[in-house]
Amino acid sequence: MNMKYVLSVINNLRDEWYKPPSCYYHRKRIEFEYQSYARSAIDEICFYLMEHENENPITAVENFRHMVDCFACETKNGDANFMFSVYYDVASDVLDVLLGMQ
């Protein structure tokens, strides 16, 4: 898969699936945090892919997902644990899309 194409698909996912809702102030705090972390996760996945551009994108996203899962398991901080679990969920979504593109 072409890395530029993969990155554009992932950025489109961010804009479509995790776009900031227009009613920010009427949402529950946890929903707002989830959406914010999800958008951040997409950005981190893109950075990770750019750093590992010679690697297969599917393998790179699997490695990213494993890495954040390890972070979630090792942290004792509840807020950080929530963030890493969101990153894991988003990486799983991205991985599903990439596998579907094969």
Place the predicted regions along the sequence by residue.
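Extreme N-terminal leader/activation tails
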Residues: M1-C23
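Short intrinsically disordered terminal tails
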Residues: M1-K4, C23, H52, D96-Q102
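Tandem-repeat/low-complexity and Cys-motif detector
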Residues: N2, K28-Y37, A80-D89
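A generic structural signal for ordered secondary structure
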Residues: N2, Q35-R39, V68, A72-T75
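Intrinsically disordered and other compositionally biased segments
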Residues: S8, L13-D15, C46, E62-N63, ...
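Generic structural signal for well-ordered, non-transmembrane alpha-helical segments
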Residues: N11, Q35-D43, S85-S92, D96
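Amphipathic alpha-helical interaction modules
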Residues: E16-H66
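Amphipathic alpha-helical binding modules
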Residues: H66-Q102
